[in-house]
Amino acid sequence: MAPKKPGAAGPKKAQKTRRREKKNVPHGAAHIKSTFNNTIVSITDPQGNVISWASSGHVGFKGSRKSTPFAAQLAAENAARKAQEHGVKKVDVFVKGPGSGRETAIRSLQAAGLEVGAISDVTPQPHNGCRPPKRRRV
């Protein structure tokens, strides 16, 4: 019989999970990435560390309903609520992408109680880069 290896089939230790400490960040940045299929809202501190995030899929929408403005509204409200728990009161908004949830997400950040400062569009523009997808024929 082979000697037993230490810790081979012994009792498992409980995993130590570290609770994220609540930061107190009064001013942050809201990054809204709106694609044709989804909308992702991330709220960060001034250094760029993510405080809270939400997306249309994370809120509970699936398939083509993720790309609706209503799904973007709920995602932005969810992210704003979580950010307010960390003390965020004012945000600058950076919008990226061509999706339908851009304006709705900005409005719902304001409606959730965050003061919106500057709004800037940071959608990347190709200098004749990749070939775009072919036209749809319906």
From Swiss-Prot:
Residues 1-12 have a biased composition (Low complexity). GO terms for cellular component: ribonucleoprotein complex; ribosome. Pfam families: Ribosomal_S11 (PF00411). One of its GO terms (biological process) is translation. Residues 13-22 have a biased composition (Basic residues). Residues 1-27, 119-138 are annotated as: Disordered. InterPro entries: Ribosomal_uS11 (IPR001971), Ribosomal_uS11_bac-type (IPR019981), Ribosomal_uS11_CS (IPR018102), Ribosomal_uS11_sf (IPR036967). It comes from the Bacteria. Keywords: Ribonucleoprotein, Ribosomal protein, RNA-binding, rRNA-binding. One of its GO terms (molecular function) is rRNA binding. Located on the platform of the 30S subunit, it bridges several disparate RNA helices of the 16S rRNA. Forms part of the Shine-Dalgarno cleft in the 70S ribosome. Belongs to the universal ribosomal protein uS11 family. Part of the 30S ribosomal subunit. Interacts with proteins S7 and S18. Binds to IF-3. This is Small ribosomal subunit protein uS11. It comes from Mycobacteroides abscessus (strain ATCC 19977 / DSM 44196 / CCUG 20993 / CIP 104536 / JCM 13569 / NCTC 13031 / TMC 1543 / L948).
